[in-house]
A protein has these predicted regions:
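Active-site-proximal loop and beta-strand segments within enzyme catalytic domains
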Residues: 14-18, 26, 40-139, 155
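Glycine-rich phosphate/pyrophosphate-binding beta-alpha loops
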Residues: 206-213, 276-291, 303-308
Length: 339
């Protein structure tokens, strides 16, 4: 994997990256593991802040489980679960999952807002665009999804993840609010904040929410990916899985499956490696997972790239992290072709 290692070296030397763990696999077989670090080398069990990958590893997967169990329907309105005004009652579960609720990224750090009542604050955010008209990436929408899940199942989100996902998949090192005795790669500027979620909305809510908060490692993420390669088994049935991986926003600016990014010509961060119809997701802290369900190829990238860029530039350079993903995927493509 000389091209991939050369790409990593360039980003480290430029100060855009300190720690990274990459796994390249195909059809359940690991093709390569790459670990690099400016100080202590991470391993396959080192914990990373998964950031928005929480949306697919936890929240949308729990919804697919709920749909599979006939507990909820994609066309259910949010008004079935919480009081809403006339406009917001048009929002469906599908709108929430594919980011078409009309509300973009917003801070929920308000006096009086807390874990128990955050849904009311989300439902009172003014719309940026009409519901269902466009994809606007929405962390508030996924925070609301987390609260709906808790109402549907009668359990807190972290407990639902453990019982319905982590336990069946034997994911032993994936947690919300993990114990500080674990080995982490820090996603925060301050050393004393290691092991604390980076996302400010999730941190404000105590480290557990539908948009972020999960910490995981290469081995556990691989188990999640293997489940996807097995068409959802053992978590959901094949029919539910096939429903989940369709492109629901083809005519909009971003293509979205149920929770997942749907890779097509509009999406750049997978480079030339992944074919149209591949699925995946990114995390703002520097993480990504992508899977080509037809070929069985997958790539997991866990890193501290965003924190490294924040240290160098003082923030505001997520474009560098996005370009890093594109470059790494292209380098992996070259290495696989050379093998």
């Amino acid at each position: 994997m000389k091209n991939t290692k050369s790409c990593i070296k360039q980003y480290v030397e430029n100060g855009h990256l300190c720690n990274i763990a990459i796994r390249v696999g195909k059809e359940g077989r690991v093709l390569a593991d790459i670990f690099e670090a400016a100080d202590k080398i991470p391993c396959s069990e080192t914990l990373f802040d998964m950031a928005s990958i929480t949306k697919v590893m936890v929240t949308s997967m729990l919804f697919l489980i709920a749909i599979d169990k006939k507990k909820i329907d994609l066309e259910d309105s949010v008004s079935k679960f919480f009081d809403t005004d006339e406009e917001k009652e048009k929002i469906t579960i599908k709108d929430l999952l594919v980011h078409t609720i009309g509300i973009g990224h917003k801070s929920l750090i308000f006096e009086g807002c807390d874990y128990d009542n955050v849904q009311s604050y989300v439902l009172n955010i003014p719309s940026d665009v009409p519901i269902g008209s466009e994809t606007l990436y929405s962390c508030p929408g996924y925070i609301l999804l987390g609260k709906i899940l808790e109402k549907v199942f009668g359990e807190r989100l972290d407990n639902l993840f453990y019982e319905l996902i982590a336990k069946p998949l034997d994911m032993k090192r994936s947690f919300f609010t993990p114990d500080k005795n674990n080995e982490f790669v820090n996603s925060n500027l301050l050393p004393e904040e290691i092991g604390i979620v980076n996302d400010y909305n999730c941190r404000f809510l105590g480290g557990i929410s539908g948009n972020a908060g999960l910490f995981s490692c290469l081995e556990d993420v691989n188990k999640y990916v293997e489940m996807l390669l097995n068409f959802g088994y053992p978590l959901i049935g094949r029919e539910t899985f096939e429903m989940a991986i369709r492109n629901y926003t083809e005519t909009m600016s971003e293509s979205r499956a149920l929770g997942f990014v749907y890779v097509d010509e509009k999406y750049k961060q997978t480079g030339e490696l992944f074919a149209k119809g591949s699925i995946g997701h990114c995390g703002h802290t520097g993480q990504s997972i992508f899977i080509d369900l037809k070929s069985g190829l997958y790539v997991i990238i866990l890193s501290d790239a965003t924190n490294s860029c924040n240290k160098k530039y003082g923030g505001g350079r997520y474009d560098v992290v996005m370009k890093m993903r594109e470059d790494l995927h292209n380098a992996i493509k070259e290495d696989l072709e050379d093998a």
